Amino acid sequence: MQAFARLLDALSYQPARNGKLRLIEAYLRDTADPDRGWALAALTGSLDFPAAKPALLRSFGEERIGAELFHLSYDYVGDLAETLALIWEARPDTGPPPSLGEVVETLQRATKMQTPAILKRWLDS
């Protein structure tokens, strides 16, 4: 998951189309299956996790620091994932973060009731 996060970060700062293609090509070349396939699916918008939607993530932020402060922070930062990353303190004793494949496969199997606990556990890692 960390390598995919680095790819997304690099893509966001790369203005040139060919530069973006080189970044994606390098990632796909250096990444083993199934993460390579899941990354391609994510980049093309083919993944859907019915139980993990932005409203659920917003509710985590509101619980964490209060609704008003979260909305002010989100408005200032402008991106939900970035806002959560800035306000969510990782706990050092939670182990390594999951791989991209683990994230996708777990969220595909998770029920609506299981998803919040899974996502919070990952945010803590």
PLM region spans:
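N-terminal nucleic-acid-engaging modules of covalent nucleotidyltransferase systems
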Residues: M1-S125
